[in-house]
């Protein structure tokens, strides 16, 4: 029996899937002349792409690390924090690009919603790891 979409719980690794989607969306937008003109691409476009790729690769890296080793758990937490930090940098870059290039509001809204959703998923994953670590320690 299948579960209705509205009743589904988020998958454990929606964070990874959404990060890849956000990275793709960011790369596509950063290369569009109407969003980041060539004159601004070296300053804004490249940084947007680099930040999106950093976020996605750090999430992938964190996912390969296990919680049953103290060293790996610590490294995983660091990768998660760095990925979360990248989402905040990405949000700043998106707002800056909008202020400079005045691309469409609907694109800005959708893009920032994707980033906010990724931040929520990342925080949820980090909280889940924290709860699992505490449960294993008890």
Enumerate the predicted regions with their spans.
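Amphipathic alpha-helical assembly/interaction segments
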Residues: 1-138
């Amino acid at each position: 029996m299948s579960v209705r979409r509205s009743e589904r719980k988020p998958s454990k690794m929606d964070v990874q899937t959404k990060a890849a989607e956000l990275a793709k969306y960011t790369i596509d937008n950063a290369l569009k002349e109407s969003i980041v003109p060539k004159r601004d691409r070296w300053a804004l476009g490249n940084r947007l792409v680099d930040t999106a790729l950093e976020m996605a690769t750090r999430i992938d890296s964190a996912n390969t690390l296990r919680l049953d080793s103290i060293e790996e758990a610590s490294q995983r937490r660091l990768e998660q924090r760095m990925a979360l930090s990248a989402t905040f940098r990405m949000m700043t870059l998106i707002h800056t690009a909008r202020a400079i290039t005045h691309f469409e509001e609907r694109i800005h809204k959708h893009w920032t919603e994707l980033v906010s959703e990724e931040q929520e998923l990342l925080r949820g994953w980090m909280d889940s790891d924290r709860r699992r670590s505490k449960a294993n320690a008890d």
